[in-house]
Amino acid sequence: XEKXIVVGLAADSG
């Protein structure tokens, strides 16, 4: 997903 933007928030589910 959007690494660095929402690090850990959504666990990179994209």
UniProtKB/Swiss-Prot annotation:
Q: In which pathway does it act?
A: Carbohydrate biosynthesis; Calvin cycle
In alphabetical order, the GO MF annotations are: ATP binding; phosphoribulokinase activity
Q: Which domain of life is it from?
A: Eukaryota
Which transformation does this protein catalyse, written as a reaction? D-ribulose 5-phosphate + ATP = D-ribulose 1,5-bisphosphate + ADP + H(+)
Using the UniProt record, name the top-level EC class of this enzyme in a single word.
transferase
What residue intervals traverse the membrane? none
Q: How does it assemble?
A: Heterodimer of a 40 kDa and a 41 kDa subunit.
Entry protein name: Phosphoribulokinase, 40 kDa subunit
The organism named in the record is Selenastrum minutum
